[in-house]
Amino acid sequence: YMSTKYNLRESTKSSYLYTYDHYVRDTFGKKRIADIKYSDVLQFYYYLLNEVKIALGTLDTVHCLLHPTFQLAVRDEIIRNNPTDGVMKEISRESSKNRGIRHALTVEQQRAFMEYIANHPIYYHWWPMFTVLLGTGCRIGEALGLRWQDLDYDKRTININHSLSYYQKPESNKSVLRISKPKTEAGIRTIPMLDIVK
């Protein structure tokens, strides 16, 4: 499947290869594709969640790799149906019953966290970064990728149009930093610069 994807970003390709090597290759990857059924995929996904203890988001990455792989096998007439169809929907439905609702930090929790960082002998130098993250809602890669030209102090705005990512190059032991544009147009945005961020 990966050899047919010429338009994948290097970081996405690296993430898929890492995911395959760490969660699929030595387990599910040893099965013959024609022998795999829906129930096998469901069991494998539950194994990853309950035994390996991966997060639901990581499982989604596994699925984003396996689903199109099986879909390609359907198109190539190796198998008739994609055994991954509907599995994530079932997993998500079951998972949402057992998972609590995520809550953002309260203002008091944010204040306590920032005070802790500011007064900590080791972490105090991270205070400006956490101030930007909390004050903008940026993702970590977006905040790390900010340049002076992205900041407009007169209009009090921050232009988010790229992010910094760190990933291992496929088939190499070298890791690289790379500036890249957001995957979608919605990722390009202008946000207000709060007083504390300024």
Spans of model-derived segments:
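Secondary-structure transition/turn motif
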Residues: Y46-N50, N159-S165
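Basic, Lys/Arg- and aromatic-enriched nucleic-acid-binding interface segment
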Residues: L56, D60-C64, R75, I79-N81, ...
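Phosphate-binding active sites in nucleotide-utilizing proteins
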Residues: D150
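Compact Cys/His-rich, Zn2+-coordinating modules
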Residues: L164-V176
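N-terminal core-binding DNA-recognition domain of tyrosine site-specific recombinases/integrases
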Residues: M2-D76, P83, P121-I122
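Short glycine/proline-rich turn/loop motifs
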Residues: D26, R93-K97, R178-T184
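C-terminal catalytic core of Y-nucleophile DNA break-rejoin enzymes
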Residues: S11, T157-N159, Q168-K169, I179-K198
